[in-house]
Design a protein with these regions (language model features):
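Conserved hydrophobic packing residues within short motifs/helices of P-loop NTPase cores
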Residues: 55, 78, 102, 151-153, ...
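Pre-Walker A (Motif I) flank of P-loop NTPase domains
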Residues: 48-54, 75-76, 124-126, 185
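Walker A/P-loop
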Residues: 49-68, 78-81, 190
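ASCE RecA-like P-loop NTPase motor cores
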Residues: 2-12, 44, 96, 123-125, ...
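Conserved pre-motif I regulatory segment
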Residues: 10-57
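Conserved helix/coil segment N-terminal to the catalytic DExD/H
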Residues: 60-63, 67, 108-151, 159-165
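Conserved nucleic-acid-binding Ia/Ib motif block in the N-terminal RecA-like helicase ATPase lobe
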Residues: 23, 77-79, 84-137, 200, ...
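Post-DEXD/H (motif II) to motif III coupling segment of the RecA-like Helicase ATP-binding lobe
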Residues: 145-215
């Protein structure tokens, strides 16, 4: 599918339309016949403008939980990911499907990064993957100030836990997303978070109003 057409852009207050377009996007873009487990509920909640915390095992289809809402909502979906290699793999896979995806991280030279920034401003990107340290730069924050934002997805959200092996201090600063863009929905995702870590994610990312979706392992 060619994503030059920016997609259906459903109304947040029309649950039936969201459900219908979400399933159509799953079929048409990603080639799956049906959602699995809580995916449909998560997609509908975030596409409708709600915040979410998603705990789902690796291989459970976490990525679709933010990719589809990003395609349904107007603007660019911004995905914060700490893993450069995974970022590249996700963007490559999305481009193969015809989704307009790009990334900003330290692997890009200045010219390549500027080209991505121009594409974002032009409205030519549906999903932008950003390393947390890049997101927090004044240049990137100002870039996002100038465009319409569909959502923020915070992947590997357990990196916010100061007690965990994967702690990333930049994640503690991601409250800026809510402070700077309070109307933009946020979805935090992780495959490894016990109840204590989930509480820490909620507190440190200011997700007190987020609906929690906890899948069994």
């Amino acid at each position: 599918m060619n994503r030059e057409d920016p997609g259906p852009h459903v109304a947040a207050d029309d649950p039936a339309s969201i459900d219908r377009e979400a399933l159509a996007t799953l079929n048409r873009v990603f080639g799956y016949p049906a959602f699995r487990g809580p995916q449909a509920s998560i997609v509908a909640h975030v596409a409708g403008g709600g915040d979410a915390l998603v705990l789902m095992p690796t291989g459970g289809g976490k990525s679709l939980c933010y990719q589809i809402p990003a395609l349904l909502r107007r603007g660019v979906g911004v995905v914060i990911s700490p893993l450069i290699a995974l970022m590249q793999d996700q963007v490559d896979a999305l481009r193969e499907l015809g989704v307009r995806a790009a990334f900003l991280n330290s692997s890009l030279g200045a010219r390549a990064a500027a080209a991505v920034e121009r594409a974002v401003v032009a409205g030519d990107i549906d999903l932008l993957y950003v390393a947390p340290e890049r997101l927090l730069t004044p240049r990137c924050l100002e870039l996002l100030d100038g465009v319409r934002l569909a959502l923020f997805a915070i992947d590997e959200a357990h990196c916010v836990s100061q007690w965990g092996h994967d702690f990333r201090p930049e994640y503690l600063q991601l409250t800026v997303l809510h402070e700077r863009w309070p109307q933009v929905p946020r979805i935090a995702l992780t495959a490894t978070a016990d109840a204590m870590t989930r509480g820490e994610i909620v507190e440190r990312l200011a997700l007190q109003s987020a609906r929690q979706f906890v899948s069994s392992f």
